[in-house]
């Protein structure tokens, strides 16, 4: 079993928003990846973006700039 580490989890209302986030992050060299929404969190769709917790402000500004709507941003051990 892998060791859990603090992560920033960004959830979305729809799968389309999650996929759009993945595409934009790849195009703009933002680190992170799409993951299934962890059990500790409830979300509109089953996908979430996972990245380092110190990226919270950067990701919030990036999503606002790119027009990506998210449901929730939380830091959890993942």
Where are these regions (language model features)?
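C-terminal structural segments of small proteins and small subunits
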Residues: 50-78
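A generic, residue-level signal for flexible/boundary positions that often mark functional hotspots
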Residues: 6, 28-31, 35, 62, ...
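Amphipathic, hydrophobic secondary-structure cores in small proteins
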Residues: 9, 15, 19-56, 75
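Solvent-exposed alpha-helices and their adjacent loops that cap or buttress functional pockets
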Residues: 1-4
